[in-house]
């Protein structure tokens, strides 16, 4: 498992594993409200109200993603970027379709089609 997490943390693209999807998340802390902003170039941009100390912002990101995606917090695993604005999160594979549904312009750019 440690080897897999090391491999994933070096990977720059969002990749699909059997049953899982690694999503890159860009976090803005100390925001006015917790919200998912957009999906741009395969990176999900989010804002959280928490400060980046003692894991508070990371916990807020996990809670925000779980709420936005309507999945349990236990299905959202932070695998890289604990001390960074750029994080990698392991999610169930089925979530990719949901995200592309929420951000249609991203789905056309990832499939090569123009809207």
Curated annotation (Swiss-Prot):
InterPro entries: DUF167, YggU-like_sf. GO terms for cellular component: cytoplasm. Belongs to the UPF0235 family. NCBIfam families: DUF167 family protein (TIGR00251), PRK00647.1 (NF001887). This is UPF0235 protein CT_388. It comes from Chlamydia trachomatis serovar D (strain ATCC VR-885 / DSM 19411 / UW-3/Cx).
